[in-house]
């Protein structure tokens, strides 16, 4: 099997893969953000990178080093900025980082680029960075960019299988069953099942306050219970994600 990690290649090897072989490059985008007492701060970028690796292996692509810092954690979907360890970027910083990175990949000769996002709050700023980079590259940009959130590839039957009592929604699934199960599949050594808290589900009002109110968020930072998480469920999810994202990449890029 050909190596897939850009940062483990020499520059001539990388050049051959993107310019001669036409390899699709995957750029994982995540965050450094609290995920309760049972998951690591790097969960978002670890999962984005792991999903990227699974799909890249399937389609013959490459995986770039992840963007490990993301947009500011929001109370209703990430617990907020008041937790120690959560290390975030302003919107303009993230947009600029994405803009520069996309332009650099175009300069390398990359023709197909996939931004695989693992941090809910990143979505709009990744989009803006991509859009500005494409504009910078002129009327006939040399590369095509796909942006995706990996959770959008879960099907309803899979969610019903994982949540027989009802799916609470992606925002409340922060550090809960989905992420914990996927971490058990990809990085079981980083999961502390014995520390899963009893907090959640969080009950938020239908509005936001600024400055944010930390009391809205359970003390653990977990927005729904992760006690139903299992490695088996993680395997179901990873299999579906890999199949469906690989199919989307092949559809758009051949």
Predicted segments, located by residue:
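Extended, histidine- and acidic-residue-enriched regions that form the cofactor-binding/catalytic faces
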Residues: 1-113, 118-254
